[in-house]
Design a protein with these regions (language model features):
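C-terminal segment of classical bacterial N-terminal signal peptides
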Residues: 14-23
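Exported/periplasmic ABC-transporter solute-binding proteins
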Residues: 25-100, 104-293
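Hydrophobic H-region at the start of alpha-helical membrane spans
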Residues: 9-10, 237
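Bacterial N-terminal signal peptides that target proteins for export
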Residues: 1-9
């Protein structure tokens, strides 16, 4: 009888160890834009792993990949800094706003120009303004850098928020790059360039972030809507996602999760609660389909 008791006890202990190991080994994978990763996902996922033991692996690839891979079942979660587009490969996902970012217009640190108007930005990317002296700077040619394609997170949102035209072509003289990372590196190393990025990423680089309409790109100005080029950041999940994904969503939307987001300098949903009406109007002005954002 004693041997049987010992046997059952050993099995019970083994069962506990197996369950514990399974819980520790549980893993979710996330893929998406680098801006979203830097804005919140890196620190939120680290805190979630410490709290629950669930490991979250992070991969880049851009906002479009963050949406498409989740839709195709290749990733549990994604990150995007743009809304869903009406494309077949982007169907079947939910985009959950978790915080607010803003487009940043960046240049080299040595550039004495501090501020641009929206009209000046339009003319620069149209190729109508080609020299920094035309906007109060020195006699140096402007080197425009931009993301390839028109549906990247930064590229799409720049076209909608600044130009009100998602199909807008930038100047043919623009230097095109594959992602925001290389664009930011060019701004760090190359004098007289100008390009769009996201503040959540750009502020961690050695670049100059230009004011727009005299407004600094600060947490307070984004939250108050004073800085005009704000946009939501999204967590992407599959419709009908499993419970582990839903648990993470609950965490990131909780006060604890939002506090982590704020600690990263990203505007929280609460602090940016008054931005939605303006943002919705901006999207409609750009001809964006209601319900996609």
């Amino acid at each position: 009888m004693r041997k049987i008791s010992i046997l059952f006890g050993a099995v019970a202990v083994l069962g506990i160890l197996v369950v514990g190991t399974t819980a520790q080994a549980l893993e979710l994978n996330w893929v998406g834009c680098g801006i979203t990763k830097k804005a919140f996902m890196k620190e939120v996922s680290r805190a979630y792993t410490e709290k629950t033991g669930v490991v979250i692996t992070l991969q880049g690839g851009g906002a479009t990949r963050g949406i498409v891979d989740v839709a195709a079942g290749k990733a549990d979660m994604g990150g995007s800094c743009r809304h869903v587009l009406m494309r077949p490969e982007e169907r079947g996902v939910r985009l959950i706003p978790v915080g607010w970012d803003a487009l940043a217009v960046i240049t080299h640190k040595s550039n004495p120009v501090d501020s641009l108007t929206l009209e000046q930005i339009k003319n620069i990317f149209d190729g109508m303004i080609i020299n920094w002296k035309q906007v109060g700077g020195p006699d140096r040619m402007i080197k425009v850098i931009a993301r390839e394609g028109k549906i990247s997170g930064v590229g799409r949102m720049a076209r909608e928020l600044v130009f009100k035209n998602p199909k807008k072509d930038f100047t043919s003289d623009a230097k095109l790059v594959k992602s925001s990372g290389p664009l930011e590196k060019m701004a760090e190393k190359t004098p007289w360039v100008v390009g769009f990025s996201g503040i959540s990423s750009a502020r961690k680089r050695n670049v100059k972030i230009l004011k727009i309409e005299g407004k600094e790109l600060s947490y307070q100005n984004i939250a108050a809507g004073q800085y005009l080029l704000f946009r939501p950041l999204y967590l992407v999940i599959k419709r009908g996602a499993n419970q582990e994904v839903k648990n993470f969503v609950q965490f990131i939307m909780s006060q604890e999760g939002q506090n982590i987001i704020k600690g990263e300098g990203t505007v929280t949903l609460k602090d940016g609660s008054n931005l939605w009406r303006t943002y919705t109007a901006q999207m409609r002005d750009a001809g964006t389909t209601p319900g996609t954002f």
